[in-house]
């Protein structure tokens, strides 16, 4: 009984602990560390760990890009010879996925200094004590973000390892269960190398290399998306807290100076959140654009593969790939929509709070805040695209146009 009570009290104490900022960033950090990368400077990083991560990162990138080049050569040769058209189009889906993953890794490593500044500013805004955190409802925001993240990376891990391990499982079933010693060796992804990879230990080397490359690419993609969504979730949390703080203020019961100080603090807080959104867009804008462009092509090519008739095992993997592409788009669009809604709520909160008895000068100043809040903060894929749930329908329309074109080319 004493042990159970101790366990329960330990759990209760754990719940009562303040939630650090790191809790929002831990999923992204785990995937970045798996490829030997740190997206931003950590406070307590040791020199030997940084050196080890650096060389791990170089090895992972060399392997990933070697696999990418071999896949590209396969596609060029297939198109040039006019053969293996279906395999080439399937490879284009994988190539698009790898190129975007490669680009995201490069983009985040290039923006490390700026990302460190954003995380530092969020750390300064983050309430530290349990009593301070209560009005922010941090536990609710963290649990919501965690659910999205776990489903997101869980689906993609199932996807990548379904592709990676399919032929290994096929080999084990045929060899050890069915006793079929003669069957064609296959790799997870079609590629070209200047030697016969299907004989000897070369096959195992190529298989492991493609598996490691696929996981590295996936880690770069997942980490970038989850890091961006974590930062957006934190900014949304602050917008919601600011709205509640404004609505709870009763103006006019104290001096004008007291109301003016409240307004100054509110405007400074609002401006800091707006600047954070701008920095997030500058860090992730190009990455977001590549996300949506590549997703449209992936949806198109995978949809094409599904309509031309495939084996049941290939069809299952294609459906999984298509589903993951859609999950990625919806997750980013959902967080972008929440940012728009939360930032627009500032103007509504200013209008709703008790300002009727306030000084005329105070009331005039409120108009400026409402006017600024009518221009909501948004996630932007550079200057070309404002992201929201409406963007998803635009993406699906674009994907269908590419699909119709590809289908026509195949029929003709």
Swiss-Prot record:
InterPro entries referenced in this protein's UniProt entry, alphabetically: 7tm6_olfct_rcpt
Record bears the keyword Cell membrane: yes
Recorded topology in the membrane: Multi-pass membrane protein
Membrane-spanning segments: 57-77, 85-105, 153-173, 220-240, 283-303, 315-335, 383-403
One GO MF term attached to the UniProt entry: ionotropic olfactory receptor activity
Principal place of residence: membrane
Domain of life, source organism: Eukaryota
Tissue: Expressed in olfactory sensory neurons in the maxillary palp.
Pfam families cross-referenced by the UniProt entry: 7tm_6
Residues on Extracellular side: 78-84, 174-219, 304-314, 404-412
Subunit field text: Interacts with Orco. Complexes exist early in the endomembrane system in olfactory sensory neurons (OSNs), coupling these complexes to the conserved ciliary trafficking pathway.
Miscellaneous information on this protein: The atypical heteromeric and topological design of the odorant receptors appears to be an insect-specific solution for odor recognition, making the OR/Orco complex an attractive target for the development of highly selective insect repellents to disrupt olfactory-mediated host-seeking behaviors of insect disease vectors. Odor-evoked OR currents are independent of known G-protein-coupled second messenger pathways.
This protein's name: Putative odorant receptor 85d
